[in-house]
């Protein structure tokens, strides 16, 4: 359900019901309504006609209804809104994703399907739109602006510029331009970014930002280009600067370690701005099921000391204003009846969820299972690669046979840094130093036949086996980490055979694998089964790497190729510098020594 069109007849029935001239279709009585406009909690009855809230009135004053539900003093909130999400991070198709989040109280999402778009182009966005049709989740899609995120430094499955953006922005299901990740292109006036921004501005729809690390004049220039939001907050000071600059903040749940600092900064303000919203950005399937999506973030913010009414306003009224949806975000006559019942404001847990006036979920369970749209074919067979051999995973220095070489390499995971080291070379092959591992990237979209790219990694520990994934931001090429070439080839070939996903290998065996045959990033499995497989993969990864829980393994791999961010990253085109936007030769020097 992208929109719900209220017919003239339905609206006129609502008018008459509000006047007591017709019965309501549904009357929710004795509700503790959370008023997002005033911050009050008021005891009221709420009358619903069709998909529309017809009346919010004192308890017992209008009682005629075809159906009545006594809420017995439970809290009633507007449906929750996620202002920025990549559904693909759940590795679930839209109908499976909707089953989880709707039951948790999320009724609207703003989906940036740029993961699908980077594999499939405009067809990937069309799949997102069509596969979401008919679901009890209001899916507003964004037109991805970052396909690829850094042209010239990576190659994805498509290239988007002005024409593609205009095509997608003309679709009624598309609500704006998705996060503008090519900050460098915006600030330097690249023709491609001018076309993309102009398409957004001319459409009258919103333009999402990705202002990671921007400050001062650069931040001001980024806003002047037309961007109006940011979810890439890095500190409390960063959040305040961006809020003062005029950006809508999208506090995200995928970086919970930052929440205490951000909340502390917000508490220094005279009041919490309507420019503050919340988003999930990326949530893996096991965490989505176990802890929740937006509702998990709201509970974390409450734990940090923000009033529940303020936190809920971020996820309802503020979010609706951000998404230019005056029909959502308030429990008021004339608004769509997307409603959530909570039994407590200390720990939010949805007891009932109403979508467009219909009871859709109760006690965390959907009233009925959701089915995939039978008229939409899920995209498959997107890993256009032949089987690989162990020799494809060897870092070489062709200029010498035996000797030493000084190489640039990637240091760190969350925020990568440049470093260099001198290595032994035997028979033209680099001997991986103790404490180092390899990262390997291969283009998988069939658009070029470049050889695999390899680089050294420092600060990740020594991998005892290999980890492979076809889900790696943002071009989603095939990525493998490890030290042993045979294990790396084994993990990569497991994904090529299954159509994508994630795999762990060690000592010639596949320890764990999650197949994702839909675009190399979505699974066919039921959500609970996928979550269990993903958790098993996460747990078994401890045999391969001594990394921080709970999911640094996957977040780190996914981010190692994110060339739009500052620092070194490896892509299918080589070792890149996110600051200078250049491809860098990893070889600094090499020299022969006696064998």
From Swiss-Prot:
Q: What is its EC number?
A: 3.5.4.2
Q: Print the keywords alphabetically.
A: Hydrolase, Manganese
Mind listing the GO molecular function terms for this protein? adenine deaminase activity
Q: Some GO term, biological process aspect, for this entry: which one?
A: adenine catabolic process
Q: Does the keyword Acyltransferase apply?
A: no
Swiss-Prot/TrEMBL cofactor(s): Mn(2+)
Q: Where are the transmembrane segments?
A: none
A Pfam family matched by this chain, by name? Amidohydro_1
Q: Which reaction does it catalyse?
A: adenine + H2O + H(+) = hypoxanthine + NH4(+)
Q: Which Gene3D superfamilies match?
A: Metal-dependent hydrolases, Urease, subunit C, domain 1
Subunit info here reads:
Homodimer.
Annotated family: Belongs to the metallo-dependent hydrolases superfamily. Adenine deaminase family.
Name of the protein: Adenine deaminase
Question: What species is given as this protein's source?
Answer: Serratia proteamaculans (strain 568)
């Amino acid at each position: 359900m992208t929109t719900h069109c209220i017919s003239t007849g339905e609206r006129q029935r609502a008018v008459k019901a509000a006047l007591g001239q017709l019965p309501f279709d549904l009357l929710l009585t004795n509700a503790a309504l959370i008023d997002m406009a005033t911050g009050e909690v008021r005891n009221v009855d709420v009358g619903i006609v069709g998909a529309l809230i017809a009346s919010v009135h004192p308890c017992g004053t209008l009682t005629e209804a075809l159906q009545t539900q006594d809420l017995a003093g439970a809290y009633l909130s507007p449906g929750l809104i996620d202002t920025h999400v990549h559904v693909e991070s759940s590795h679930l198709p839209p109908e499976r994703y909707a089953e989880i989040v709707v039951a948790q109280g999320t009724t609207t999402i703003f989906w940036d399907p740029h993961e699908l778009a980077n594999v499939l182009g405009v067809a990937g966005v069309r799949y997102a739109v069509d596969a979401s049709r008919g679901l009890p989740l209001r899916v507003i899609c964004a037109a991805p602006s970052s396909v690829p995120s850094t042209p010239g430094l990576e190659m994805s499955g498509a290239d988007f510029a002005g024409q593609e953006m205009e095509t997608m922005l003309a679709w009624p299901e598309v609500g704006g331009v998705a996060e503008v990740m090519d900050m460098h292109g915006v600030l330097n006036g690249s023709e491609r970014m001018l076309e993309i921004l102009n398409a957004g501005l001319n459409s009258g729809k919103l333009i999402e930002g990705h202002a990671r690390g921007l400050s001062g004049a650069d931040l001001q220039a980024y806003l002047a280009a037309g961007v109006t939001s940011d979810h890439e907050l890095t500190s409390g000071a960063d959040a305040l600067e961006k809020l003062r600059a005029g950006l809508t903040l999208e506090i995200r749940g995928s970086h919970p370690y930052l929440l205490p600092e951000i909340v502390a900064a917000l508490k220094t303000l005279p009041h919490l701005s309507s420019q503050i919203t919340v988003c999930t950005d990326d949530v893996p399937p096991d965490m989505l099921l176990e802890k929740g999506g937006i509702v998990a973030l709201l509970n974390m913010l409450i734990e940090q000391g923000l009033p529940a009414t303020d936190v809920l306003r971020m996820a309802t009224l503020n979010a609706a204003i951000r998404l230019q949806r005056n029909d959502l975000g308030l429990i008021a006559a004339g608004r769509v009846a997307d409603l959530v019942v909570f039994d407590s404001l200390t720990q939010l847990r949805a007891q009932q969820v109403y979508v467009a006036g219909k009871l859709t979920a109760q006690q965390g369970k959907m009233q009925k299972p959701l089915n995939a749209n039978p008229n939409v074919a899920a995209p498959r067979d997107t890993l256009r690669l032949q089987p690989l051999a162990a020799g494809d995973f060897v870092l070489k220095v062709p200029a010498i046979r035996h000797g030493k070489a000084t190489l640039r390499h990637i240091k760190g995971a969350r925020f990568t840094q440049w470093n260099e080291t001198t290595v032994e070379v035997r028979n033209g092959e680099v001997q991986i130093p103790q404490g180092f591992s390899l990262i390997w990237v291969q283009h998988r979209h069939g658009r070029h036949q470049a050889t695999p790219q390899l680089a050294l990694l420092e600060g990740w520990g020594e991998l005892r086996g290999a980890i492979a994934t076809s889900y790696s931001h943002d071009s989603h090429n095939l990525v493998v980490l490890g030290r042993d070439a045979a294990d790396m080839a084994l993990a990569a070939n497991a994904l090529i055979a299954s159509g994508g996903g994630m795999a762990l290998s060690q000592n010639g065996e596949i320890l764990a694998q999650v197949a994702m045959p839909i675009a190399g990033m979505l699974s066919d499995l039921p959500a609970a089964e996928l979550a269990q497989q993903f958790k098993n993969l996460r747990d078994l990864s401890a045999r391969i790497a001594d990394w921080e829980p709970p999911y640094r393994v996957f977040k780190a791999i996914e981010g190692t190729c994110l060339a739009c961010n500052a620092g070194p990253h490896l892509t299918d085109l080589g070792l890149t510098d996110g600051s200078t936007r250049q491809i860098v030769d990893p070889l600094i020097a090499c020299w022969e020594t006696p064998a």
